[in-house]
């Protein structure tokens, strides 16, 4: 509520902003985890 007042926004706008940030963070962390795992799998394959 205090954040909303200080930024001259509604509580709803603040809630949506935080929700969007959480979704973006989840998406980015999922992409990072999948890229790290695929890189790790490449390293584990034996080379001839």
Swiss-Prot record:
One of its GO terms (molecular function) is DNA-binding transcription factor activity, RNA polymerase II-specific. The keyword Transcription applies. One of its GO terms (biological process) is anterior/posterior pattern specification. GO terms for cellular component: nucleus. Residues 29-48 are annotated as: Disordered. Its main location: nucleus. Keywords: Developmental protein, DNA-binding, Homeobox, Nucleus, Transcription, Transcription regulation. Residues 1-29 bind DNA. InterPro entries: Antp_homeobox (IPR050296), HD (IPR001356), Homeobox_CS (IPR017970), Homeodomain-like_sf (IPR009057). It is found in: Nucleus. Belongs to the Antp homeobox family. Sequence-specific transcription factor which is part of a developmental regulatory system that provides cells with specific positional identities on the anterior-posterior axis. This is Homeobox protein Hox-B6.
